[in-house]
Amino acid sequence: EEVYPPDEDTFLLLEAAIREARPEDHVLEVGCGSGLVSQELAGRVKSITALDINPHATRAARERGVEVVRSDLFRGIRGRFDLIVFNPPYLPTEPEERGDQWINYALDGGASGRETIGRFLLDLADHLRPGGRALLLISSLTGPEEVERMARDAELVAELVASKGCFFERLMVLRITRSDQAL
């Protein structure tokens, strides 16, 4: 299968997103995979747009009735959002472990597990509306303290809002806001 199927991380992010979402929110889901999170948020928010680099994922999300754009992170998106949710590729992956299938875009976080997360954090503030926030799923394997440092370096503030132990890792959802706004 070429699309990341909903799993423990998907459901943890979905639960946090449902708690965080407001009826007036314009929402962006980055890396939507199957489109489940966007589909579940659709009736709870003003608008939702999903994106994914994987053409198989965009097709799967579209089949769920989700408005989806094929894009590498924010490249295909203009505008600002009240809420941005992202379940990034966060698994540390050595070069010799990398595959060339589309599913690898959902899994391969680079050597540290933070390559895609770093790119996301660098551009995040430009896509948040005033008072906007993001929910970012990470793993204990990703180095949570390092992710929080990366957020600070991008003038963002990260706060843990959900976590769950799973097999060999702890999954966490960080709520991220611009450092120039109160939490």
Language-model-detected regions and their locations in the chain:
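Short beta-strand element of the conserved SAM-dependent methyltransferase core
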Residues: 107, 173-178
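Conserved SAM-binding loop
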Residues: 50, 109, 136
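Glycine-rich, phosphate-binding/catalytic loops in enzymes
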Residues: 44, 100-104, 152-154
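Flexible, glycine-/basic-rich loop-and-beta segments that form/coincide
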Residues: 180-183
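Conserved SAM/SAH cofactor-binding pocket of Class I
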Residues: 8, 12-99
